[in-house]
């Protein structure tokens, strides 16, 4: 089973983002992630046979906000800023593989051969901001893929202090 830990945006943040995307219009060149899949990854564990032991419960709850956008090859994302996020991600295992942690919310995917599609949207969303919110829990998510695409489901919850 493919597992990762994440923070889920609250409904008011999801609604604000949905409204902004509706205002901007839909671009068929991008494969948009459904709002039910929006999350901020803390740690990625890959395909593992059992649930990892995680010491996340009771850690300080980070205050987060969306500010700005960017791209990875083939991925359009929103930047997640906030105090305490890097520490929580580190506790969840981010960076253990030697890669730098980049807090983000994946919005869409596009053909790597067409980087301009993602870059144009990143520019359009660069000024998008949300009010801060406090992430009161981290979740362990399972990723499932079928003919309809990828879906995520919460396996465990870790309450945070704050």
Q: In which residue ranges do the predicted regions lie?
A:
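Histidine-dependent nucleotide/RNA phosphoesterase domain, centered on the 2H-phosphoesterase fold
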Residues: 1-162
């Amino acid at each position: 089973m493919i597992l990762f830990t994440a923070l889920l945006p609250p409904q008011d943040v999801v609604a604000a983002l949905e409204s902004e995307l509706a205002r901007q219009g839909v671009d068929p060149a991008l494969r948009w992630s459904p709002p039910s899949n929006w999350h901020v990854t803390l740690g990625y564990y890959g395909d593992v046979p059992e649930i990892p032991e995680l010491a996340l419960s009771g850690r300080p709850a980070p205050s987060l906000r969306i500010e700005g956008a960017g791209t990875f090859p083939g991925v359009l994302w929103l930047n997640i800023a906030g105090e305490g996020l890097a520490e929580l991600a580190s506790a969840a295992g981010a960076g253990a593989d030697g890669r730098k942690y980049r807090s983000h919310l994946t919005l869409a995917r596009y053909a790597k051969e067409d980087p301009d599609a993602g870059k144009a949207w990143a520019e359009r969303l660069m000024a998008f901001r949300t009010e801060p919110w406090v992430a009161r829990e981290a979740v362990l998510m399972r990723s499932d893929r079928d003919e309809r695409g990828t879906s995520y489901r919460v396996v465990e919850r870790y309450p945070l202090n704050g």
